Amino acid sequence: MDNRGHFSSNGNFPPQGYHRREQSQEGMRIGNHHGPFSSGNMRSIGGSAQNQQQRHWTNMLNGSNNVENSWVCFSGNTSLADDPNVLSNFSALAQQRVNHFDTIVQERDNRNASFLNGSAVGNNLNTSFSVFGNLRGGDQDHRVLSDHTGIYTGLGSTGQNAVGTGIRLAADVANGNFLEQRAPTAMGHNQSYSALNQSLAPTLLDQYNQALLDQYNQSSQMAQGRGYPAPNIAYGLQNAGFPAPQIAHRPNTQNADPQAMNMNNRLRDHTFQMPHTNAQVPMSSLPGLFNLSMNHGSGNQQFQMNQSSSGPAPQLPNLSESFQMAQGSSQVTMSSRPAHSNTSMNHSSRNQYNHVDQRPSRPAPHLPTLTKEEEAFLETPDFEQFGRQLYNYLLPGILPNGAADTFSDAPKHQLLKLAKTLKPMLYDYWRKTMQMQNRGANINIIQWIIDFNAKFAALNSSVAKASNSSDVLNQTLPTAAEVSDVAREDASTSQPSKSRSMYIRPAASLDNTLETLDENLDSSQSHAGPVPAASTKPKTPSFEKMIRYSGIKKRSTMDMDNFVRMLDEKINFSPEPSTSSDIASSVKGYMSQSFLHQQDDEAPDCTKNVHSESDLKQAEPQESDKQSDKELPSNE
């Protein structure tokens, strides 16, 4: 009869008793090393000799017999031939016990059982057990009910529950090896349980091993050939999932269970374990996880894989590899950083160890959250001008990232645009600076920048007027009103004005840094006429000076060092290769002086004064600004 119906109907998980026995087995292993261990989950046939049995196994494991690497399995060879309801190789009771207790011990009722000699003895109460069908010289186990103890579950090497037996031996009685009295039970024919008032034999397994080894020498040699422990017959448990060698010369093969006696084992088992001398391949039935360990060849070569179905797909780096062939152990190390890639492989007969160390590359910069109006404003010339001034104020001498841009209407003027990731960062930095300066007030930063550009342009225009020269910046600036109007129009439409197409030109004639751009605005604006020849030509007001006059204290509201470090880590400063050397030289000092300008065909006359007196008055700093400027320590 095919007894593979051990597991539940879905074929995936065993019944509850399976788990309880497995937990009990773990407990026994603890007890083997730390003394007797009791577990209420251990089950014998009668269910009443749990503690006794565990002490029995504990004593054995502390002795010379390593049960944890042994298979001791028992099977019967009789049948109830006159029972029309049962097949010829199993009794109904045995089949029920196999499925319920994970055993392959067959129980026979001597009233109906047939033996090797074809005779039947006993009566209804003479229930006995067969261990491979016979003991010592082919004699059948004919002892009566009173000579038997229970058959116990639990043997450590299979990962499941093997069976023990408790047949009373004369040597045990004479030597006083019986432990405490218990009342195990054994099944009789057509009976659920019947009591047995007998003791347990602690040395039973050793004596059985010797008897079976003598009787089945050939089978024992087969066991050694397959790597099984030599002291025990290599007979695989059906529920353990590992192969068992053929044992067919002594038992009654005509009536023996072919499913348990040959190499064909259960197909739906979930474990596969072998002794430590062979390869161990533990696999979990969970769909997303598995561990695989294989022993192959004389040199121990291990591959351990941990796979999770919930994790993301691996990102494979595109790297150059260097291979080193060497004898002995070696390591394979991989990194996703292009500058530190080292791969070494070993193709020797020794141990091979593979290690993969993958570090993520630089994270993408965290861009602030902006409104649509703010995003549109970042693309206008107003913010381009202010962003360049602010960038150079924070990082003087470092050009922002971007490709060279060639304007169709002015091919000689090329400039580096602010990167798209740099604009939001600069805007957010200045927005936070203004909020901190004004104690969290919600300020219209867009309007502030537009007004700032207009005021800055008016101040530069007043300096040019005072010096009676428009060549201060080598360009003519529009009025403050024009700057504000164009910037507001661009911000509202997010498109450059068609009538006033603005762009930024580099101040090629200026070679000034932030440190040399400071001036005394009071003295420069007090001159209404041409500057005397003996006087020094006034300098252009610096962005830093304008910031201070706007009420922002230098490096007093934000941690500049952290912001600079953030820019350095998250922005890749690498201009396009097409940027020529003359452009690089022309932008020297350019970050501090970039202004809006009209197209060449709309440029006003450079000799005319395009600024009104009201513009100049509006551009002049107030008394409060002058006073606050005097209070600030100069760190120029």
From Swiss-Prot:
Modification Phosphoserine, positions: 574
Phenotype of gene-disrupted mutants: RNAi-mediated knockdown results in sterility, and in P granule segregation defects. Simultaneous RNAi-mediated knockdown of meg-1 and meg-2 results in defects in P granule disassembly in the anterior cytoplasm of the P1 blastomere causing some P granules to be mis-segregated to somatic blastomeres.
PTM description: Phosphorylated by mbk-2, which promotes the disassembly of zygotic P granules in the anterior cytoplasm of pre-gastrulation embryos. Dephosphorylated by a phosphatase complex containing the PP2A regulatory subunit pptr-1, which promotes the assembly and accumulation of zygotic P granules in the posterior cytoplasm of pre-gastrulation embryos.
Keyword Lipid biosynthesis recorded: no
Sequence ranges of Basic and acidic residues compositional bias: 608-636
Cellular component aspect of the GO annotation: P granule
Segments of skewed composition (Polar residues): 1-13, 38-54, 292-355
Positions of region (Disordered): 1-54, 289-367, 484-504, 521-542, 591-636
Subunit architecture: Interacts with pptr-1, pptr-2 and pgl-1.
Protein name per the record: Protein meg-1
Annotated organism of origin: Caenorhabditis elegans
